[in-house]
Design a protein with these regions (language model features):
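Conserved, well-structured ligand/cofactor-binding cores
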Residues: 1-166
């Protein structure tokens, strides 16, 4: 999916900066990798990633696809052959690490961009229901038996609180 490719670009950009910091690649190599990764993050070159997320092993195919695309486009950007898919773009990395890391980045982004806003909407809807049902008394239940009466709005506030504090 597009979001996985985006996450791989974020990861490869971060790795390039770390590899520059530790003198594993040159500044010119880092600049070329970062430029291509930022373009991929902006949605460019997605047609260069034909693989499906379902694949054998540890995601080696997607990792190598990313390395090769970044290397090819980075060399075009630098106007010279300074990047190699394994030796520079994939420096200090392993498919066993990059694929799970990219998945974690993708999931974290999806949680922040999609799940949390939906939970905020749910919380607001429950607050409205609490206000609309204020004063309505219902029988509490515990151990499949009747318990102390409570306001329906209190029960709703318990559900809301669980969502807010989870």
């Amino acid at each position: 999916p597009k979001s996985l490719i985006h996450s791989f670009a974020i990861l490869k950009e971060a790795c390039a900066k770390a590899n520059l910091h530790f003198n594993k690649i040159s500044e010119k190599q880092c600049e070329a990798i970062v430029k291509v990764c930022q373009n991929i993050e902006d949605g460019q070159y997605l047609d260069q990633f034909p693989l499906h997320v379902w694949q054998t092993g540890s995601g080696t195919q997607t990792n190598m696809n990313a390395n090769e695309v970044i290397s090819m486009l980075g060399n075009e950007y630098a106007k010279e052959n300074i990047l190699h898919p394994n030796d520079t773009v994939n420096a200090s990395q392993s498919s066993n690490d990059t694929f799970p890391a990219a998945l974690h980045i993708m999931v974290a982004q999806k949680i922040n961009e999609e799940l949390l806003p939906q939970l905020d909407q749910m919380i607001n809807q429950i607050k409205k229901l609490e206000e609309e049902n204020e004063g309505i008394i219902k029988i509490g239940r515990t151990h499949l038996q009747d318990a102390t009466p409570l306001y329906f709005s209190q029960e709703l506030s318990g559900y809301r609180s669980m969502i807010e504090h989870s």
